[in-house]
Design a protein with these regions (language model features):
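Conserved alpha/beta-domain cores
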Residues: 1-129
């Protein structure tokens, strides 16, 4: 931000799920809050996990590769709802610390969107209990 940036246009989060160490909710929360602190009140846009084509989540898919046009983006996340919920809950908690937007990759139809919003609603209920 010191060089005049107006925020973080796209923070890729997939690296947090590298084989051997998948960050839990608290670790993700701490990472996102550190990004928000570094942005000093400017908007941070986080892209949710985007596995497929050139990226895999080995622990979730047990080494199965996605095809180029098949299981990618939001559809990949929706196949692993527990991990998606962990990320969304961490993002929602972090959003209390600064301006944060969430971008779901490769939403192709209303079913993708509705399914993602069900996860968001689940996390909202969980965090307000």
């Amino acid at each position: 931000m010191e060089s005049g940036a107006s925020g973080v246009g796209l923070l890729r989060s997939s690296y947090m799920m590298m084989p051997g160490h998948a960050m839990d909710e608290q670790e993700q929360y701490l990472f996102y809050t550190s990004c928000l602190a570094a942005a000093k009140g400017k908007m941070v846009t986080v892209r949710t996990f985007d596995f497929g084509a050139d990226r895999t989540m080995a622990d979730a898919y047990q080494g199965v590769q996605s095809s180029k046009l098949g299981l990618r983006g939001i559809r990949s996340s929706l196949r692993n709802l527990p991990q998606m919920a962990v990320q969304i809950c961490a993002l929602m908690r972090a959003a209390a610390k600064g301006p944060l937007r969430v971008m779901f990759p490769m939403v192709t139809d209303i079913e993708d969107w509705d399914s993602a919003m069900q996860v968001v609603d689940h996390c909202r209920r969980k965090l307000t209990e």
